[in-house]
Amino acid sequence: MTSLLITGYKSFELGVFKDKDPKVNIIKKAIKRDLKRFLDEGVDWMIFTGNLGFEFWALEVAKELQKDYPLRLATLFPFKTHGQNWSEANQEKLAAFKQVDFVKYSFPAYQSPAQFKQFNQFLIDNTDQAYLFYEPENETNLKYFYNMIIAASDYPLFRLTFDDLNEVMSE
């Protein structure tokens, strides 16, 4: 079993506020290219944390790829209450994260910021590698997770960058 943790920018961090935004198609094209490569290299589990934006788009692509690959999907939410205050449209996306092969949460509810660090460490300790859409120059809260991955020297990290998206766009 080879697992791939998938996470990255949230939609609002990319200036994407509608599902039909043209940027989404470019991002999904890059995701599909990369996920196929991971699958061809033996990845058979893709792990999500239930975030909107990059993770949701990757989930959509992964569900499509399940038709052609022996792929299993999991969502590990940080909290049982994750997404409970989302809009109705986003509740549908949350439901998609729950309609996978394996679903668990780490904590019943948020109590302290330390839970995020514990959750991130759990993800690193229990997955084989990460696929991350993040650039340190465009800093968000992902910086904490990114820095933990970098500190874990034996944990492979594959990044999708804005340069990669420009390449996909020019193809």
UniProtKB/Swiss-Prot annotation:
Where in the sequence is the signal peptide annotated? none
The entry assigns this protein to a family as follows: Belongs to the UPF0398 family.
Give the protein name, as stated in the record.
UPF0398 protein stu0232
State the HAMAP family in the record: UPF0398 (MF_01575)
Question: Which Pfam families does the protein's record reference?
Answer: YpsA
